Amino acid sequence: MLLWFLSLVCSGFFLVQRMSAHVGSHDKPFLSAWPSYVVPLGQNVTLTCDSHRGSNIFKLYKEEGSPNHQLHETTFQKSQVFGPVTTEHAGTYRCFHPQYANVLSAHSEPLKIIISGIYMKPFLLILQSPLVDTGGNVTLECHSENMFDTYILISHRMGIIKNSVQVSAEHHESGSHVTYSIGPMTPDLVGTYTCYGANSYYPYEWSDSSDPIDIKITGVYKKPSLSALMGPVLMMSGETMALSCISDHQFDTFHMSREGVPRGQGMPAVQSHSGKFEAKFLLSPMIQKGNYRCYGSFRNASHVWSSPSDPLYLPAKGNCPAYTEADTKTNNYKNLHILTGLLVTMVLVVIIIFYSCYFSKQNKSQKQAAASMEQEYEVKNTINTQNFEGQERQEVTYTELEQRIFNQNLMPPISRISEFSADTIVYMEIMK
């Protein structure tokens, strides 16, 4: 009888344990935070505990972090708003539903609440283009002047945190940093990335968020075509140029890039009369030269792009011709002919300037020589006049013929003038 009673008690005990385990695992609630479990200092966060039983009453308790006296022996209705949050709200939380006296539901999985904005934000850099081919890799670097122990890289999609990676930091004289390699690239890895810094002794207190970087994957869909609008349909405003991106695919949005870097926001696609989908991009008057490409994407996957269009080269700002790679060789020949013509013109101009300077100097030299000869003539005339002052007055006739120097002295030397003082002296000097 005693053995039968003990056997019945043990069976009942194990049956209750098994039923409790079954009920607890089936009724395990789910604890979530909105808008995110990473909460900026001073902002609000809403904690919600959901259950398959549809119960709206639950309790919270904190496993790690500073004690939160607001939770002690307090029952909440479905959701609870905390805020403005401080470092006291940081920690690990669980929730459960009180069912009846001394019987509780299973506890939820732990939920970490992180308070950000405790330290200055780090800087996030991308070491390649943010447009990554399918299967490619990309490297991100997060660095700061603060000596953080760890950095946390977080990816967002539609404003919701998808993944996070925590890596130990490397220290150096100017601060700390860490590098992340992402790839091979798939649509699941793309999104908006930010990074935070933290210290091991305060794991629930992070720095402010870095500036975001958007990483897109390309090559998922067929490439569109890109062209410059020419002729009467050219959409111009001053020196603004219009580019057209067109595709057979029913893309929602088209995007533009220059030298692998996205430019501005995407443009909505419009279906043309031919049934194709098109978007027009107006480039500012100060057009930067380079290779332009366009891509297509869908609204529900804005980080997943098509293959790039063939490059369209814009060589200069303003109203400039546009070239594709097929036109490059032809344009190079044209440019070579233009350059050759300019060089020949420059050489001719230099030669003309040289000869002009040469003849100018020659004329100047001739004028100086003529002036010098005229001055010499005046000096000689003065000397001859003075030599005859002591003699009898004689008649001297000067004749100037053209510009050749020719002296004909019909008078005797000066020493013999006195002997022929009665004769007429004819002096003829022809100067050039």
From Swiss-Prot:
Record topology, Cytoplasmic segments: 357-432
InterPro entries for the chain: Ig-like_dom_sf (IPR036179), Ig-like_fold (IPR013783), Ig-like_Receptors_ImmuneReg (IPR050412), Ig_sub (IPR003599), Immunoglobulin_dom (IPR013151)
UniProt entry keywords in alphabetical sequence: Cell membrane, Disulfide bond, Glycoprotein, Immunoglobulin domain, Membrane, Receptor, Repeat, Signal, Transmembrane, Transmembrane helix
Segments passing through the bilayer: 336-356
Domain Ig-like C2-type: 42-100, 135-202, 238-301
One matching Pfam family: ig
GO terms for cellular component: plasma membrane
Positions in the Extracellular compartment: 22-335
Membrane topology: Single-pass type I membrane protein
Disulfide cysteine pairs (residue numbers): 49-95, 142-195, 245-294
Signal peptide: 1-21
Glycosylated residue positions: 44, 137, 300
Subcellular location: Cell membrane
Family per record: Belongs to the immunoglobulin superfamily.
Main function: Receptor on natural killer (NK) cells. Inhibits the activity of NK cells thus preventing cell lysis.
Name of this protein: Killer cell immunoglobulin-like receptor 3DL1
Organism of this sequence: Mus musculus
